[in-house]
Amino acid sequence: MPYRCSNCRRTHPAFHLSCPDCGAWNALLSIAEEFGAGDSLPVALPDVEGIPPPRTQTKIDPFDRLLGGGFVPGSSVLLIGTPGAGKSTLVLQLLRNIDAPSLYVTGEESVQQLKLRANRLEINSHKVFLLFETNVRRIIGHIERLHPAILVIDSIQAMYTDLSGAAAGSAPQIRKSVYALRRSAHRKGFILLVVGQVTKQRGAAGPKLLEHAVDVVLYLEEGEGSGNRRILYASKNRFGSTLNRCLLSMTESGLLFSPAAGARGAEIT
């Protein structure tokens, strides 16, 4: 029976504990196992049992409406915007309102810098854990121990995985990092909230697959004519509409939401 290495993809006629070509340990899988049916079985649509888990609401009505009723457990959400738009501020406010065990992983700011921002927002919850880490494998290890309801990655361009030898922020690293974290979210049922940088062309920095690999894409943009106005909208939403947007103002105490969400393309007053 032939075996293929999951690391270098070379094929070998016999099993080895380590790949004879690349040296990876426990990486050889039989061809039959690699392309087998797996653990799950096809189920007819009428026979699917159970109901979807309830959405996790932020208690911010305009934001929950924007998502279609709140976060869907096990989903992946990408939040992108220009530097200084308030992405980290928004994330901390969401974690405070949800009030569930959460892990905020930063690969750019120190945890001390995040703590200073949290102090300014008067956030001091024992349910919010901060971690400076860029290795996806180690992050998943912390997930197994903490069992968070929400995982924040800030930012995905700073992360890397041992499965790729490319530099952090490169297309291979972003692809492997996003898919590894998304698989973990599906398996454990936590909400994955990924923060990404935005380019001048209004695209997520890195390969376009960053947007294709998640369930929801949120843009946080600065409003025209004023330095404190922000616009938040979904360019992609598998669980709701993309026609609405949130209007916000940046203040000393954080981002304030306008009571009503506007329609995409409407004038801001």
Describe each PLM feature range.
Residues 2, 16:
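Residues immediately within or flanking Cys/His clusters that coordinate Zn2+
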Residues 94, 117, 203-207, 230-234, ...:
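Short beta-alpha junctions and helix-cap segments that line functional grooves
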Residues 11-15, 25-28:
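Cys/His-rich metal-chelating microdomains
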Residues 20-28, 32-45, 49, 144-146, ...:
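Conserved P-loop NTPase
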Residues 5-8, 19-22:
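Short cysteine-rich clusters marking metal-coordination/redox-active sites
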